[in-house]
């Protein structure tokens, strides 16, 4: 199943972070914080402005992004967890 977000919404798949501390201690899932880094899976058409023009979304499918800890709404599609959030909730795009 594919998903197409509406307006300025973006679908993101969280990227797993290292589960070992710098000292070599393995951090269990129950103690680990959810990662705030993810990969853009799908983007909407853009935000419709008050004057009727559409401002396109600035992120692209495949971009790795940084977002807030509580950003987005968690959804499950075909057994996979995703976040659906507004583009405004994305703080940065990783480059290079």
From Swiss-Prot:
Keywords assigned by UniProt, alphabetized: Chaperone, Cytoplasm
Pfam families: Cpn10
One GO process term, biological-process aspect: chaperone cofactor-dependent protein refolding
Principal location: cytoplasm
GO cellular component: cytoplasm
Subcellular localization(s) per the UniProt record: Cytoplasm
InterPro entries: Chaperonin_GroES, Chaperonin_GroES_sf, Chaprnonin_Cpn10_CS, GroES-like_sf
Role of this protein: Together with the chaperonin GroEL, plays an essential role in assisting protein folding. The GroEL-GroES system forms a nano-cage that allows encapsulation of the non-native substrate proteins and provides a physical environment optimized to promote and accelerate protein folding. GroES binds to the apical surface of the GroEL ring, thereby capping the opening of the GroEL channel.
Record-stated family: Belongs to the GroES chaperonin family.
Family matches, as NCBIfam families: PRK00364.1-2, PRK00364.2-2, PRK00364.2-4, PRK00364.2-5
PANTHER family: 10 KDA HEAT SHOCK PROTEIN, CO-CHAPERONIN GROES
Assembly with partners or alone: Heptamer of 7 subunits arranged in a ring. Interacts with the chaperonin GroEL.
Protein name as it appears in the record: Co-chaperonin GroES
Organism for this UniProt entry: Halorhodospira halophila (strain DSM 244 / SL1) (Ectothiorhodospira halophila (strain DSM 244 / SL1))
Annotated gene: groES
């Amino acid at each position: 199943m594919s998903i197409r977000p509406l307006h300025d919404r973006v679908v993101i798949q969280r990227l797993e972070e290292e589960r070992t501390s710098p000292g070599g201690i393995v951090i269990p899932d129950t103690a680990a914080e959810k990662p705030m880094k993810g990969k853009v899976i799908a983007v909407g058409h853009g935000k419709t402005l008050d004057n009727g023009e559409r401002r396109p979304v600035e992120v692209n499918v495949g971009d790795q992004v940084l977002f807030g800890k509580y950003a987005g709404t968690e959804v499950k599609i075909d057994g996979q967890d995703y976040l659906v959030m507004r583009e405004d909730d994305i703080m940065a795009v990783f480059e290079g």
